[in-house]
A protein has these predicted regions:
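Face-selective signature of the C-terminal outer-membrane beta-barrel domain
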Residues: 1, 14, 19-172
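Intrinsic-disorder/low-complexity recognition with aromatic hotspots
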Residues: 6-9
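Short glycine-enriched, charge-decorated loop/helix-capping segments at active-site entrances
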Residues: 174-177
Length: 177
């Protein structure tokens, strides 16, 4: 990289070599369902569990050579990023017929979500390193009730839903909490 002034005189210049010595990304998702049908026609009880996982690791390195009049005091850097995301979802649903064309559906759901990240940067040629670690938690609890009506080509649905969410983000070193 070269930045030129009027008259094509270089203000500064350097060569940059960039590469990624490490990169991994894994994502897993799964689901389990259990459904129980009762003796009553159309009535069922369902339990569900879902899992979502993501793991990512990235290393990015820059090295600078042939430095002339640069405004930075280092000769390169290594940036390391790590992310861990985990989400568990639990759900229960009950569907009960109330008569011909009428149904009641009641359910609840709980989500536990954790996201953690660590970032660091090492500078070459000077004694200066940076690092940040962040933890984020979200918990969601919800409940619902629906009335469902079906008649020939027509259907209608009315319901209520309540949802409560708790969120917290923190830096383990205590800064900016």
């Amino acid at each position: 990289s070269t930045w030129l002034e009027h008259g094509d005189q270089p203000v500064y210049s350097y060569n940059n070599h960039y590469w990624m010595p490490g990169y991994q990304h894994h994502s897993w998702n799964g689901r389990l369902d259990y459904e129980h049908k009762t003796r009553r026609k159309g009535e069922r009880f369902t339990l569900s569990y879902m899992l979502a996982l993501t793991r990512q690791h990235t290393d990015q390195e820059n090295t600078y050579t042939e430095l002339q009049n640069v405004s930075f005091p280092y000769t390169g850097s290594l940036m390391t990023e790590r992310e861990r995301f985990t989400e568990h979802t639990f759900q229960a649903d009950w569907l009960r017929p109330l008569g011909k064309g009428h149904q009641l559906e009641i359910g609840t759901k709980y989500i536990d979500r954790n996201n953690n990240s660590e970032n660091s940067q090492q500078f070459y040629g000077i004694d200066m390193n940076t690092s940040d670690e962040f933890h984020h938690v979200t918990r969601v609890l919800a409940g619902y009730a629906d009335y469902i009506y079906n008649h020939e080509k027509w259907s209608a649905r009315a319901g209520l839903r309540y949802e409560y969410s708790y969120m917290r983000g923190s830096y383990p070193d205590g800064k900016d909490e």
